[in-house]
Amino acid sequence: MVMDIEAKKAVIDAHAKHEGDTGSPEVQVALLTARIEQLTGHFKVHKKDYHSRTGLLKLVGQRRKLLNYLKKKDVQRYRALIEKLGLRK
């Protein structure tokens, strides 16, 4: 269920601002989005996995908080990230 190292590194490299950037909101939101997409695929097979569904809701809430923070700090970066990841506002 956990993302493998190569997939995680690819997501980080695609959204990092500089070498070794793992803490910026863009990278964190991108990692959470990848994890959420992975879990939604899991739920297509395992419809009654309610325990993991609560974890999914926590991840979605965490992503929402980071997006709200980014929107408050820099609207241009927020809009660019939303468009790049294909998320709704």
UniProtKB/Swiss-Prot annotation:
SMART domains found in the cross-reference section = Ribosomal_S15
- Cite a single GO MF annotation: structural constituent of ribosome
What is one GO biological process annotated to this record?
A: translation
Q: Which Pfam families is this protein grouped with?
A: Ribosomal_S15
Look up the record and report any one GO term of the cellular component aspect.
cytosolic small ribosomal subunit
Q: What PROSITE patterns does its record include? A: RIBOSOMAL_S15 (PS00362)
Give the domain of life.
Bacteria
Residues annotated as coiled-coil are none
The alphabetized UniProt keywords are: Ribonucleoprotein, Ribosomal protein, RNA-binding, rRNA-binding
Give the function comment from the record: One of the primary rRNA binding proteins, it binds directly to 16S rRNA where it helps nucleate assembly of the platform of the 30S subunit by binding and bridging several RNA helices of the 16S rRNA.
Q: Which family does it belong to?
A: Belongs to the universal ribosomal protein uS15 family.
Q: How does it assemble?
A: Part of the 30S ribosomal subunit. Forms a bridge to the 50S subunit in the 70S ribosome, contacting the 23S rRNA.
The protein's name:
Small ribosomal subunit protein uS15
List the source organism: Nitratidesulfovibrio vulgaris (strain ATCC 29579 / DSM 644 / CCUG 34227 / NCIMB 8303 / VKM B-1760 / Hildenborough)
Source organism phylogeny: Bacteria, Pseudomonadati, Thermodesulfobacteriota, Desulfovibrionia, Desulfovibrionales
